[in-house]
Amino acid sequence: MSNNYKNPTKVITGPKTRWSYANVWDPKSINGGTPKYSVSLIIPKSDTTTVKKIEAAIQASYEEGESKLKGNGKSVPSLKVLKTPLRDGDLERPDDAAYADSYFVNANSAAAPGIVDADRQPILERSEVYSGVYGRASINFYAFNSNGNKGIACGLNNLQKIADGEPLGGKSKAEDDFADDDDDFLS
């Protein structure tokens, strides 16, 4: 059931998006702030469709949020000088191979995201979703002006896991660690 209204600030990423720093089951507090659910979405630079959708949503958020961005000032700051969520992994994470040849967006929310599998069935087993899986994300962009900081932020709505991936963060899966039989165990 789809309605005809298309929210210009909402994006569904492509299926090759990789999830990193996936705090999607329990909210996490950063520097004593409000606990939030969050994920870093790693988008291959080759996924130009998703990148263009994100750029358009950032522009729409800027236009919708001009009064908020203006605040008490006389004019709205240019989008070029504002903090925006689409970032270049090659420039900002040069030592992390997972971010090579990719853009990334950090999305968060105070509310838990819905998490489904490729067949749109809810995922209830926490071990199924980890940093390194591939999937689509429903995200929205919005303007903010808080404590002198102005920009466009990214909210996390829902996640759809499409495929398993190599776990990120150096932790291996138990089934991989013990995959090889040690024939000379007792010798």
PLM ranges: what are they?
Residues 1-104:
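OB-fold ssDNA-binding interfaces and closely related basic DNA-contact patches used
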Residues 116, 120-187:
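Compact mixed alphabeta submodule
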Residues 40-42, 106-108, 160-162:
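Residues in well-ordered beta-strands of folded domains
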Residues 67-148:
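Structured, beta-strand-rich domain cores
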